Regions:
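Nucleotide-activated sugar donor-binding and catalytic core shared by glycosyltransferases
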Residues: 1-293
């Protein structure tokens, strides 16, 4: 048996495997509108390729629709396997001084932000600071080379800030903490109760919320989450995320979140339950082809 994952479609390999009568499976298939248009422009090839899979398992309904058009014969929508991923518990790598500072603050995080979204978050911070004197806003921009532009916007709002790579400059008056490094986002999620996921107020398509929700965070996002629509729809259904459209709505939602006695473990377990069901159902399908061979 040969298993291909998500969008990893290798034409020559698929055709050669099929010649040997080896079962072909496409797990957690993901086809975006952009990639669908490319495959559909060479429909004779795509129908030959996708038609050779014994079964395909799309991770969402959009992919299901595209697979049908592209010639897949047997399609089973079970769900997105990414729900089944587990977070490994491990301590953060912050210095003792930084950990002490964070523990003294009421923290929320704005992650993967794009141009204009940082200003919206900073305005929200300034308003909320009137009520929460120890408030700290952590901003993790999607592109760290924009840090200089972001600091100018923060200066214009007369807010005190510190840049993560300059840890020694942090002090009790720091209001905005700007992260200019890669690979530490999870560490910041672990110390935050609430996370705003960027690329969603602007028309970028949003960011995958599963990493933050698996760590028990309250999720806030803008209206533009088309890249992960079905995940956000499910989170909304479970009451695990909140959509906002502007700074005023962000302020209101954060205020509610700060005073909400939420159970992060409950959120984590909800996602685990969804993931376990998807994983179990997928395993049973794969097992059928293992035994069949």
């Amino acid at each position: 048996m040969a298993i291909f994952i998500e969008s990893e479609i290798w034409p020559n390999m698929i055709l050669n495997i099929k010649k040997k009568s080896i079962p072909l499976l496409l797990l957690n298939a993901r086809i975006t509108k952009k990639s669908f248009n490319k495959w559909n422009s060479i429909s004779s090839l795509s129908k030959n390729l996708f038609g050779n899979f014994d079964v395909t398992f799309p991770q969402n309904n959009e992919t299901n629709k595209y697979l049908k058009i592209l010639g897949a014969k047997k399609i089973k929508t079970i769900g997105n396997l990414k729900f089944s991923e587990n977070e490994i518990k491990k301590p953060n790598t912050f210095s003792k001084k930084l950990n002490t500072f964070f523990k003294s603050k009421k923290i929320w995080c704005a992650s993967s932000t794009h141009k204009s979204e940082e200003k919206i978050c900073a305005i929200a911070h300034k308003k909320l600071k009137q009520k929460y004197k120890n408030l700290l806003t952590i901003i993790i921009p999607r592109h760290v080379h924009r840090i200089k532009d972001i600091t100018e916007e923060i200066k214009d709002l007369e807010l005190n800030y510190c840049i993560h790579s300059s840890k020694d400059k942090i002090n009790k008056n720091t209001e905005i903490y700007l992260v200019d490094t890669y690979g530490e986002t999870k560490s910041f999620f672990r110390i935050c109760k609430t996370v705003f996921l960027g690329g969603s107020i602007i028309s970028h398509g949003g960011q995958n919320p599963l990493e933050s929700i698996r760590l028990g965070c309250n999720i806030i996002h803008g209206p533009n989450v088309r890249n992960f629509k079905e995940i956000y729809d499910l989170l909304k259904l479970k009451g695990l995320s909140k959509k906002i459209n502007n700074s005023n709505q962000l302020i209101k939602t954060l205020d509610i979140s700060f005073n909400k006695k939420g159970n992060s473990l409950k959120k984590i377990n909800q996602i685990k339950k969804i993931g376990s069901k998807i994983l179990d159902n997928t395993y049973r399908e794969v097992e059928y082809y293992i035994k069949k061979k």
